[in-house]
Amino acid sequence: MSGGWDESKYVDNGEDEVVRQVSEPSVEEPIEASVTRYRSDEEKLDDKSSGAHVTEKEAEFDIEGGSRETSQWKHFLNVAVAGVALMSDGYCSNSIGTVITILRKLYPEETTHNKSLQDIGMIAYVGTIVGQLSFGWYSDRFGRKNGMITATIILIVSTALCTGAYGYKGSINGMLSALIAYRFFLGIGIGAEYPCGSVAASESSNELKSGLRHAAFIVVTDGAIDFGFVVGALVPYILVCIFGEHHLRIVWRLSIGLGLVIPCVLLPFRIAMKDPKTYVKHKVPLTKIPWLLVLKMYGFRLFILCLIWFVYDLSAFAFGLYSSTIVDGVLPADASTARSFGWNVLINTFYLPGALLGGVFSDLLGPKYCLITGLVLQSIFGFFMSGFYNQLVHKIAGFCVIYGIFLTLGEFGPGGNIGLLASKTSPTAIRGVYYGIAAAIGKCGAIAGVYAFGGDQVRNYFYAASAMAIFVAVLALLFVPKLKQTCIEDEDKRFIQACIDAGYGNPYNYEKNEPEQLEEPDRPPAFNPFLSATFSFHHIILC
C-alpha cells in the first residue's frame, strides 16, 4: 500500500493543479507507514505535475481536460509572449547602427569631430543597465506580468519620442542631444525585458514537455533578439530602396519608428496573460530571504556568469552595432547606400541559424557543452579571418560568408546559452535579481565594446574576439554547472534544503519530506490603525 501511486487519492479540481484527497490512516496502518505513503505520493505528485511520469491516458488529455498537444502549444505561447519582446533589443541595437551611418552622411560637419553619434549608440546600453537592475528587483517583488507590462509601455513611449526627435529651432546638435536622451529611456524599457520577460519565459518553459524546454527558451529570447537584428538591418535597406538616396531623413526616422510595431502588438497579449505557475508557487518577500546564505550558495556562480556575459557582449554587440561600418570599409568608396545596407542584411541573417541550432543542441548536449562548442568553433573562424583579412577584403562575398559564420557560431554558443544559464541556475525567489545582475554586467561589456571596437582596426578586433572566446570557453568548462530539464525544480529544492539545514526554515512555507499537520486556525489580529494606514498608502501607490 505504501509507496504506490493511487489515482483514487488525487482528484481534478477543475483548475491548474491536481489536488490530493486527504484521508486518515486506517487503524491497521501504523503511523510510520502513513508518513512513508505520504512522502512517496507527494514525490510522485511532483513528478506527475512536471510531466516526468505520463500514463497512456494522460498522453492524450492533460489534467485540464483538453488535448495535451493543445496544452503544449498554449504553454509555448506563454513562453513566446514573455520572451519575444526582446526583439526590440535586437532591432534597436542594429537599426541604430544603420541610422548612425545615415546621420554621418547627412550631417558630416556636425558629426565629424563630435562624439554625439558614438553616444547615441552607447547611451541605450546605459539605460538598459538601469532597467535590468531596477526591474530585476521589481519582477521579484511585484510579479513578472506587472514588470512586462511596464516595460512594454516604456518601449512604446520612448520609441515614439526617438522617432520625432527634434532640435530647438531645427538645430542638428539639439536633435542629436534629444535622440541621446530619448534612447536612454528606450534602454530602460529594453533592460526591463531581461529580468521580467526572459525570466518569465524560463519559468513558463518549465511547463513544456521535457526535452524541449531549453530550445523553447532560446528560440523566443535569443532567437527574438537575432530576428530583431535581421529586421533592424532589412528595414533601412527597404526604405532606402523605396525613398532613394536623396530622402535619407525620412529613412532614419521610419527605421526607428517601425520599432513601435513589436511592443504594440505584444501589449494586449501581456495584459491577458498570467504570472508563471513557478513564480506564483515560490514567490517569497525579499525581506524573508536569507541573503547571506544566498551569497554563499550563488555568489561565485553569479560571478562566473557575469564574467562570461561581459566578455561575450564585449565583442558581440560591438560587431552588431558596427557591422554596417565594417561592410562600408570593405566595399568600394563609390558604393551606394543601398548596396552597403544590402550586404549588411545578408550578414545579419546568419544570426538566425545560430539561435535555432543553439536551441536544439542545448537540449541535446546541455547548455554548458553547447556554449563551449560554439565558443571554440567561433574562435577558429575568428583567427582565420584575422590571418586572411587582407585577402578577404577584396572579395566581399567571401568576407560576408565567413563573417556571417563567425556570428552564427557566437549565437550557437554563448548567445543563447548564457541567458539560459542565468535564468535557470538560481531559485525562483531571487531569479529576477540574479538574472538582472548578470545581464547588467553583460551590458557593461557591450558599452566597453562600443568604445574598444569603434575604430578601423577590424583585423585586430577579430584577433581579440577570438582570444576572448577561448578564455570564456575555459571558464565555462571549469565553473559552469550542468543543467538538466528539471533544473528549475531542482534548484528550488536545493535552496529549500539549504535554508532548512542552515536553520532559516523553509522560505516557501512548506517543509520538505514532512507530513501535513493540522494546526489551529490563526486568530484575527487586533486592529492596528498604523498598519491599516500603511496598507492603504501602499495600495494607493500600487494602483
From Swiss-Prot:
The keyword Transmembrane helix applies. One of its GO terms (molecular function) is glycerophosphodiester transmembrane transporter activity. Residues 104-116, 168-171, 244-253, 323-340, 390-395, 454-460 are extracellular. The chain crosses the membrane at residues 83-103, 117-137, 147-167, 172-192, 223-243, 254-274, 302-322, 341-361, 369-389, 396-416, 433-453, 461-481. Residues 1-82, 138-146, 193-222, 275-301, 362-368, 417-432, 482-543 are cytoplasmic. It is a multi-pass membrane protein. Residues 1-63 are annotated as: Disordered. Residues 1-12, 38-60 have a biased composition (Basic and acidic residues). Gene3D superfamilies: MFS general substrate transporter like domains. InterPro entries: MFS_dom, MFS_sugar_transport-like, MFS_trans_sf. Belongs to the major facilitator superfamily. Sugar transporter (TC 2.A.1.1) family. This is Probable metabolite transport protein C1271.09. It comes from Schizosaccharomyces pombe (strain 972 / ATCC 24843) (Fission yeast).
